[in-house]
Amino acid sequence: MQKIYARLSLVNIPLTFVTTMMVVCFLSLIFMNPELVDEFAAFWNRLIANYFAGYLIWVVALVTIFTLLIAFTPYGSLRLGKDNERPEFSRFSWFSMLFGAGVGTGILFFGVAEPISHLQNNPFLSIEGAEPLSSEAAVIAQRITLFHWGLNGWACYSIVGLCLGYFSYRKGLPLTIRSALHPIIGDKIYGIAGDLIDLVAVFSTLFGITVSLGLGASQMSSGIEYLFGTTITPMFKLSVVLVVSIIATVSVVSGLKRGIKFLSETNIWLCLILLSFILFAGPTIVILSSLFSGTLDYISSVIPLSFWVDPSIEKTWSTSWTLFYWGWWIAWGPFVGMFMARISRGRTIREYVLGTIIFPVAIGFIWLIVFGATALHIQSSGPGGLVEAVNEDISQAVFRTYELLNVDW
């Protein structure tokens, strides 16, 4: 009971109340008038694409460069904590939680669907003179997919966690988003200005969670529909969201060392089992070759891609893909960054940056290439059918891939 009272004493009651009421109002609006919410989202999409696309692209690119460079400066040897502190979690637990925090339903949802979508249409096909659905288009499709899940996205998480970890563990400030702005606004972080900063961070995370839960609900519902032939209703999808939310809440309430650590380690073992199955059941030689060639292709193209701005007036493709991804990564930044800081106390800045960027990117690339190369091979050299599956229902793409593997059990 004393622990509960101690935790409650740290809660900002006015901010929590205001935030809760605003979230309830926003969710109520979604249920009562989803068309209005769609129009609101479409308006902001157009506004960002038309006026801020270049700015967003450059900010993410420069954040990536800065975050990676700081690891190799003298500051890289500083610890996120006192100089004699050591990490709380083992490297395996740390890596598992990092991977689980930043990659969830999205990488499963888009692992097949994204490269197959890019195989049909993307602006780089005309730039490089490649025909849709060709082998050259497959290389470009894999490259773009890796770019969207690569260094740039993870740097958006890492920089937030780095700022929070530094100011919280070395300067004694609260582990909240407002602390990252202490060098700019000083002690105003303890007043209304700080509350507004945290409020914006909460809403940013809300939008990120909305996208992730939507993708996850669609993925799980489509899987059940595909396997059992049942018709999925909106109420069923809502039930899926509620179940996932309850599991996540129980995990958080049970604490880092129990719930979240257990789920993260279980998650990474399940990922390894599924990866191994696809690797050996699929075109193994093609996958292994793609792991090498795809990674090298990404390394050679990541800088020009990071600064590429869609020159078209409508920016339809970049709005649907690159700008969507960068907005999604940034929206999750406050939450994931804070979590990264929480589990990284005692590690050096160099270890933190490399651990929160290089390791998740490497694991993510293995996943994306194993699934992506398998899907592209099935479409180009196998029975085909994935283009039609993605165009019909993007959430069923991964299940159609399993079926087309045609494993003889």
Predicted features along the sequence, with ranges:
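Alpha-helical multipass membrane-protein architecture
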Residues: 39, 72, 82, 93-97, ...
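Membrane-embedded translocation segments of transport machinery
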Residues: 189, 196-347, 354, 359-409
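Transmembrane-helix boundary/entry motifs in multi-pass membrane transporters
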Residues: 5-14, 49-53, 83-101, 132-134, ...
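N-terminal alpha-helical transmembrane segments of multi-pass membrane transport
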Residues: 1-135, 253, 276
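Alpha-helical transmembrane segments of polytopic membrane proteins
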Residues: 53-61, 149-154, 237-238, 324-327
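Membrane-water interface regions at transmembrane-helix termini and the short interhelical loops
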Residues: 2-8, 36-48, 68-88, 141-148, ...
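Flexible loop linkers connecting adjacent transmembrane helices
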Residues: 2-6, 39-45, 72-91, 116-143, ...
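Helix-loop-helix module between adjacent transmembrane segments
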Residues: 7-17, 21-31, 64-67, 103-107, ...
